[in-house]
Every structure is written in C-alpha cells, then in structure tokens.
Amino acid sequence: MTSSVPSLRIGNGYDVHRLVPDRPLILGGQLLEHPAGLGLDGHSDADVLVHAIMDALLGALSLGDIGKYFPPSDPQWKGADSLVLLEQVVALVKARGWGVVNVDAVLIAERPKLKPHIEAMRSAIALRIGVAPDQVGVKATTNEQLGPEGREEGISCQAVALLQAL
C-alpha cells in the first residue's frame, strides 16, 4: 500500500480568556461593549474567536498552536491585533501548499449579546483569511449560567477549519 497525503485536512481550535475590568472586549476583530464594562485579559488583544480559528488552521497541518508562533513571553506581541496574527497564520498555511475551504466557530458567553455583531465578525475574518464571508461560520451561545462562562468569568471559543491542498 502506498502512502499519500490527503487533499483535505481538518483542524480544531479552542481558546478561553478571563473577563476583567479595564481591558477592551474584542471578538472577531470587533470592539464590543460588555454591560459590566469587562474585557478579555491576555498578552495580545485576547480575541478568543480569532485565536481559536488560528489554532484550528495550525492544527490541520500539525504545526502546533499559536503560542509557538506568538508566545506571550515575547514583548513584540503585547497588545497585538489578532487579525494581523491571523494573516500571518494564513500565509504560513499557504506557504505549505494549502488553502482554506472554510472555518466554523462557536463563541460561548453569557453577555454581551453577540448576534448583532456576528456578520461584522464574519466579514472581518473572511477578509483576513482571503475567503468569502459564506466560508466563515460564527455562532454564539450561552452556557446557561453554568461553568466559568456562565458565571461571566470568561469567554471561550471552539473552532474548526477545513483546508484543501492547492
């Protein structure tokens, strides 16, 4: 039996950040207002949606995770715009001969209500990946007041990416 590289690859990503005062709340590149004035804590802009998508893209090609490329110990990534980091991850994927078929993600947060911002998130992510907005799925759900997301201690995101050999 001969070995061949499949023409499709799938990757999973996950990220979570703590909600804290005096930080911006950025999701999918959009600056949002939390009713309690909270934002996500992190070395970069802490955009859990974009971080989960980056990890899914990297995972599809067994390239590690975003911490390998943008370590929080490196001062150059302090306050970094995650959409700019996403462009770098996509360039890495393309340099290895792969293209993005689609990405799909689910945000888990009690507040703020995310539905009014979903289309803007999808468009911003699609632009940075270089795909049409209908190739970027973003959904939001609550955790029914269970766990850290339910207690509004943080926001998390799960993502999946499908890649195709170019």
Curated annotation (Swiss-Prot):
Binding residue positions for 4-CDP-2-C-methyl-D-erythritol 2-phosphate: D15, V16, H17, H43, S44, D65, I66, G67, T141, T142, N143, E144, R151
Pathway(s) served: Isoprenoid biosynthesis; isopentenyl diphosphate biosynthesis via DXP pathway; isopentenyl diphosphate from 1-deoxy-D-xylulose 5-phosphate: step 4/6
Reactions this protein catalyses: 4-CDP-2-C-methyl-D-erythritol 2-phosphate = 2-C-methyl-D-erythritol 2,4-cyclic diphosphate + CMP
CDD domains referenced in this protein's UniProt entry, alphabetically: MECDP_synthase
Cysteines engaged in disulfide bonds, as pairs: none
PANTHER family tied to this protein: 2-C-METHYL-D-ERYTHRITOL 2,4-CYCLODIPHOSPHATE SYNTHASE, CHLOROPLASTIC (PTHR43181:SF1)
Entries under NCBIfam families matching the protein: ispF
Protein name per UniProt: 2-C-methyl-D-erythritol 2,4-cyclodiphosphate synthase
Organismal lineage: Bacteria, Bacillati, Cyanobacteriota, Cyanophyceae, Synechococcales
Gene designation: ispF
